[in-house]
Every structure is written in C-alpha cells, then in structure tokens.
C-alpha cells in the first residue's frame, strides 16, 4: 500500500516493532519503501508504539503526551521541506480495547455490556485530558501543521469537538461519503481516524483507503503549503 501510494510522510499510530538480532521492523519497512528518515516511539523496542517515516529530514521533535504503561501517545515532528518547516503530528489517543471483552468466551453478550460501559467510563476522561494537553501545545507552533490522529472517538464527541474547534478536519473540506475508518465490534462502521490541519495548510484531497493490512483504514491526504509549488502527501495507516 505504501509503495502504491508513495506518500511523502507515513504515520503509524500502532506499529509492532519487532527487533531480532540485526532485524528491526521499522528500519526494514523504511528501507523497503524508500524512506531515509524514520523513528519509533514506544515503551520498549519489542512493543507497539508510534512509527513515522519521511522523505524529508526531521529537525526537531516535541512529545505531546506519553504513558509509561500504555501504547497511546503523541509526538510532533518538525520536518525541513522545500516549503520550509512543517510540523507533522502523530497522535494516538487512549484505546478502549474492546477486543479484550469481545473475545471472552465465558461471557454471554448481555454480560459483556456492563464491561463495555465500564471501559467507556474509564477511558473517556483520559482521552479528554490528552486532548486538553495537546491543543495548547500545538497552538504554539506558527508553521504549517498536519495532524494524523487515531482519536478512538467519533465525531461530535467532546474530544473531537475540542480538536475540530482549533484545527480543520480535512474530511469536512475534501472528504466524500461518510469517511468510515473502523469496524467497531466487528460490524458497526465508524469514523475514529482524522487528519487535522491549521490555517497555514491548504487541503487538496482527503481519501480513505481500505486494505487488509490493518483493522483501521488508511487516510491519504494531499496538502499545499505557502510558498511551495510541490504538493505533500500524508498517509497514516495503523499497522500491526
């Protein structure tokens, strides 16, 4: 998929970094797809975390939030591009991890419902706190920003409204259809993944690309920055 679409930047919100001897999954992926600049941020080298690949050099990074015991985190990478410096956010808000409940064979469906509701009550406050932390941090940057985000939250939630109130949802400008990116509980189609931009960015396209490489669809966006004649593309699929 990456070779087919050939984006300038790729953001993975959930990447399994396997390191065995000389083999490193992110290094291998970057080399096979032609990205000279890449990074992984996770709890340890064998676990899930954020991964990032770019055709442009990374000159600085800013950690938006991170947990010692969760894979969810956010990081802003500052790239040196032909249009000047551009910030690319790779953000993964706290997960509900419903699969842990869905996969339990010892429970009837009616017994699972209270567990789902309890999980929702526990996770939403954490998501709200994450958004409240990252918005003022991102607003400090007076440069083009593109934010690849797995929010684990649907449109019209408090978390989405907070982000959409400060940044532009590219789906609303150039998306088509309903923009579904995830099958919740295996059957309910929802939009959990977004690309947001600030007012320094012109949105050219927003496309949702389904594939069998992940349980989330990828989003491919094309953007133009002030002073640049070249379009930049961003593709943030989740990956395991």
Predicted regions located by residue number:
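Glycine-rich, phosphate-binding/catalytic loops in enzymes
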Residues: 26-30, 69, 105-107, 162-166, ...
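Catalytic-adjacent loop/helix segments of enzymes that bind and process anionic phosphate/sulfate esters
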Residues: 60-137, 230-239
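Catalytic domains that recognize anionic headgroups
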Residues: 4-12, 16-18, 109, 115, ...
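Structured beta-strand-rich core segments of catalytic domains in phosphoester-bond hydrolases
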Residues: 9-101, 207-210
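Metal-dependent phosphoester-hydrolase catalytic domains
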Residues: 63, 78, 128, 133-146, ...
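N-terminal, active-site-proximal structural segment of metallo-dependent hydrolase catalytic domains
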Residues: 1-28, 226-240
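A broad, low-specificity signal for short, low-complexity segments enriched in glycine/proline
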Residues: 13-16, 37-40, 47-52, 105-110, ...
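Sec-exported extracytoplasmic/periplasmic mature domains
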Residues: 3-7, 31-34, 58, 139-140, ...
């Amino acid at each position: 998929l990456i070779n087919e679409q050939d984006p300038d930047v790729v953001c993975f919100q959930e990447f399994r970094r396997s390191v065995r001897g000389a083999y490193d999954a992110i290094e291998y992926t970057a080399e096979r797809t032609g990205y000279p600049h890449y990074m992984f941020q996770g709890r340890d080298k064998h676990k899930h975390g954020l991964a990032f690949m770019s055709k442009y050099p990374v000159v600085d990074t800013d950690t938006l939030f991170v947990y010692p015991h969760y894979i969810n985190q956010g990081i802003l990478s500052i790239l040196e591009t032909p249009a000047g410096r551009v910030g690319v956010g790779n953000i993964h808000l706290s997960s509900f991890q419903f699969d842990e409940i869905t996969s339990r064979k010892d429970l009837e469906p009616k017994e699972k419902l209270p567990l789902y509701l309890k999980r929702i009550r526990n996770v939403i406050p954490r998501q709200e706190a994450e958004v409240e932390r990252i918005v003022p941090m991102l607003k400090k940057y007076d440069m083009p920003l593109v934010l690849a985000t797995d929010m684990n939250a649907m449109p019209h939630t408090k978390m989405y409204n907070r982000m959409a109130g400060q940044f532009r949802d590219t789906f609303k400008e150039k998306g088509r259809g309903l923009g579904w990116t995830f099958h919740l509980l295996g059957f309910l189609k929802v939009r959990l993944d977004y690309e947001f931009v600030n007012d320094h960015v012109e949105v050219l396209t927003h496309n949702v690309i389904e594939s069998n490489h992940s349980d989330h669809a990828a989003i491919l966006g094309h953007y133009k920055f002030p002073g640049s004649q070249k379009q930049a593309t961003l593709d943030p699929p989740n990956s395991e």
